[in-house]
């Protein structure tokens, strides 16, 4: 295993869900000092407190997730909409705002958001979830070009059909209807392995990826290509 992340302090949010476990394992294998945090980020002051607790942060890896509601557009409640945005959207700018001063002072840093390809391709009964995921990606593109002159790279992985315990637990993967859907919709013909996704994330956290600015990279086995 390469040591391309040797000594880098990488903060991973919600490290116990979504891509958190695979990310922590892979980043550590590449030499990173992984700051695996599982704190609730919904309170408005939580992101600032988290960053202060961890001190020096070279890379902020924003891993935010919740079970995706499956609600007809005409039945989405105010509570559902608010909950999805409170969990997956509002913490993102707060985290960036909290970590930005130290990255600006060093003229160096990276932010990588683990997003969703659902924002790139329409999905039925997923309006609240895809709207939140789309907001994440729009934020990454805007902030990415703003911070690039400061040598701070902000990018996102937009994924779907990637093996993870939050969205594709074993019982889902074993469901015959899901297997047929995957064969029909995913050109790769299988789930992307968690390790494959995490290795790409590790690369984007490294100095080898300094040229990427406000980019959204689909990782979905071909389900979404742009």
Annotate each language-model stretch with its function:
Residues 149, 159-185:
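A glycine/serine/threonine-rich, flexible loop-to-helix segment
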Residues 2-35:
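Canonical Rossmann dinucleotide-binding motif of NAD(H)/NADP(H)-dependent dehydrogenases/reductases
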Residues 186-197:
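A conserved structural motif in NAD(P)-dependent oxidoreductases
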Residues 121, 202, 213-226:
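Short C-terminal tail/terminal secondary-structure segment
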Residues 101, 145-149, 210:
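Alpha-helical segment proximal to the catalytic Tyr-Lys
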Residues 110-135, 140-149, 161-162:
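Catalytic loop of short-chain dehydrogenase/reductase
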Residues 71-73, 77-85, 178, 182:
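Substrate-binding pocket helix/loop in short-chain dehydrogenase/reductase
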């Amino acid at each position: 295993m390469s040591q391309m992340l040797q000594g880098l302090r990488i903060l991973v949010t919600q490290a116990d869900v979504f891509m958190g476990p695979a990310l922590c394992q892979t980043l550590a294998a590449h030499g990173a000092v992984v700051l695996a945090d599982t704190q609730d980020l919904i309170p408005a002051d939580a992101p600032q407190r988290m960053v202060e607790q961890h001190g020096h942060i070279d890379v902020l890896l924003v891993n935010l997730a919740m079970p995706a509601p499956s609600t007809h557009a005409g039945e989405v409640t105010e509570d559902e909409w608010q909950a999805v945005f409170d969990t997956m959207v509002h913490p993102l700018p707060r985290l960036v705002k909290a970590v930005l001063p130290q990255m600006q002072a060093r003229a160096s840093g990276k932010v990588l958001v683990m997003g969703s390809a659902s924002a790139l391709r329409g999905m039925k009964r997923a309006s609240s979830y895809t709207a939140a995921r789309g907001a994440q990606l729009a934020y990454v593109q805007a902030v990415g070009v703003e911070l690039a002159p400061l040598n701070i790279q902000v990018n996102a992985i937009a994924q779907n059909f990637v093996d993870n315990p939050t969205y594709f637990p074993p019982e889902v993967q074993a469901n015959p209807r899901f297997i047929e859907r995957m064969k029909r919709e995913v050109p790769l013909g299988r789930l992307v392995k968690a390790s494959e996704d995490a290795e790409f994330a590790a690369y984007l956290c490294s100095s080898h990826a300094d040229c990427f600015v406000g980019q959204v990279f689909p990782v979905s086995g071909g389900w979404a290509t742009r």
